[in-house]
Structure formats: structure tokens, C-alpha cells
């Protein structure tokens, strides 16, 4: 029920969430879209679901779901996920939703999330690194994808992904990907938590790291050079 998903979003506070899970804004900032800000055609969705527990309770009442119990699965060895799970459990309890934590080893986690028949979880914590090309994000949200952990079934959204990938006009592509981001957000298919920052240790004997494009996926090591002493 979309109202239940929206209620969950309103029950959470992203700033508080990030502080609880990542300790400091130096390590992560609240996310507002499936796309990261450096992804092509990133656009902040129209509805940001600002924290509103009263609105969350209203939506749950409208959906007839005032006494929910949900299973939240996450990787047991990931300390950030563990902190996130505890925050979700606490925040949703404030609006009357019981969250049962399901810590799982990484191998089992991968098997269960990729099994479309698995019913062991209602909510799942995950992370992704997909780079600047927006079409890559379709793998997380397409009806038939094995990486569709949220079990999204939306033929209109599937069509938008296909259209965005086959359209050459830049303006039209931008409009399509904005619609995709709004569709995911409006239906609260995926609640994006944070854009985490990457940190790198470098040797002072070398230079060129600024030109190396220090991103999680893309590097150009040819830009790195030895500094003369």
C-alpha cells in the first residue's frame, strides 16, 4: 500500500537518520533521490517527505494499517546498517509500527534479496554504487531484475527506463529521468537515506590526485605522477 510506504517515509527524519548512522555530516549527507547529485539528469524530487509523525499516523489510519509488524533485514556484519536498523526500529515505533530486526550474514542476504519468492523481509537495508550513467539505476527498479530488492512491479516505470535509455535528445532524456525519480519517490518504492562520502589515503610522494577523478567507480591512474624532491 503506497500510503503505508509514504507513512514510513514521514516517520523518519533523514538528518537524524544520518547523524545516528554515520555519526557526522563529514561522512554522509541526507539523500533526496535514487540518483546521486553527480549522476546525469539528477533532479531533486518534488516531494521531500519532511519528517511528520502526525502525517505518518494519518496515512496509516487511512490505509487501515494502525497495527503493523514488519521484518527489516540487513547484513549483520555491517555496523552502519546495524545503526540504521536500530534507528528505523525506534522511529517507526513512535508511529505504532513494530519493526522486527533480521540480521543476516552477507551470503544469505544476497541469496534472499535476489530470490523473488522470498518473503522473509518486508523492509531491507542496502547500498549501491552505480556511477554517473542514469540507465544503470534501472537494475534496481525494473520489474524483472534480480537486483530489484524492493520487489517493484510497475510497467509504466519499466517503460520510462526503456524510453530514457533509447532517447537521444538531451532535453527529452532529462525530462524522462526526472519523471523516473519522481515516480520512485511519489510511490516511495525506495527510501534513499544518505549519500556517503569516500575517503582516500594518499602518499605524499605522488601528485595528480585531483585530476584522477576520485570517485568510487571511475579512476584515471594515468593522471598520477611522482613529485620531484
Where do the protein language model's features map onto the residues?
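Periplasmic-binding protein-like
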Residues: 1-38, 83, 183-192
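Soluble non-cytosolic domains of exported or imported proteins
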Residues: 2-3, 11-12, 47-54, 78-86, ...
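Extracytoplasmic/peripheral linker and loop segments enriched in polar/acidic and small residues
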Residues: 3-6, 18, 100-109, 137-204, ...
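Structural transition elements
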Residues: 10, 26-62, 78-81
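Solvent-exposed loop/turn segments at secondary-structure junctions
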Residues: 14-17, 26-28, 39-41, 76-80, ...
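Ligand/substrate-recognition segments at binding pockets and active sites
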Residues: 61-130
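Long beta-strand-rich cores associated with HINT superfamily self-processing modules
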Residues: 200-229
Amino acid at each position: 500500500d503506497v500510503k503505508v510506504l509514504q507513512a514510513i517515509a514521514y516517520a523518519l527524519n533523514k538528518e537524524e537518520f544520518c547523524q545516528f548512522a554515520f555519526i557526522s555530516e563529514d561522512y554522509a549527507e541526507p539523500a533526496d533521490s535514487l540518483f546521486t547529485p553527480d549522476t546525469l539528469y539528477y533532479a531533486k524530487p518534488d516531494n521531500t517527505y519532511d519528517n511528520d509523525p502526525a502525517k505518518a499516523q494519518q496515512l496509516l489510519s487511512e490505509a487501515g494499517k494502525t497495527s503493523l509488524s514488519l521484518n527489516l533485514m540487513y547484513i549483520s556484519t555491517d555496523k552502519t546498517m546495524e545503526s540504521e536498523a536500530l534507528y528505523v526500529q525506534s522511529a517507526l515505533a513512535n508511529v505504532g509500527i513494530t519493526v522486527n530486526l533480521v540480521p543476516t550474514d552477507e551470503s544469505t542476504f544476497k541469496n534472499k534479496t535476489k530470490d523473488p519468492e522470498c518473503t522473509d523481509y518486508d523492509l531491507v537495508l542496502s547500498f549501491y554504487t552505480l556511477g554517473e550513467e542514469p540507465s544503470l539505476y534501472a537494475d534496481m527498479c525494473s520489474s524483472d531484475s534480480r537486483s530489484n530488492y524492493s520487489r517493484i512491479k510497475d510497467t509504466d516505470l519499466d517503460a520510462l527506463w526503456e524510453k530514457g535509455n533509447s532517447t537521444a535528445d538531451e532535453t527529452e532524456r532529462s525530462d524522462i529521468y526526472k519523471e523516473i525519480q519522481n515516480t520512485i519517490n511519489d510511490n516511495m518504492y525506495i527510501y534513499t537515506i544518505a549519500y556517503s562520502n569516500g575517503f582516500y589515503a594518499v602518499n605524499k610522494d605522488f601528485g595528480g590526485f585531483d585530476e584522477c577523478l576520485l570517485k568510487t567507480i571511475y579512476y584515471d591512474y594515468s593522471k598520477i605522477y611522482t613529485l620531484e624532491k
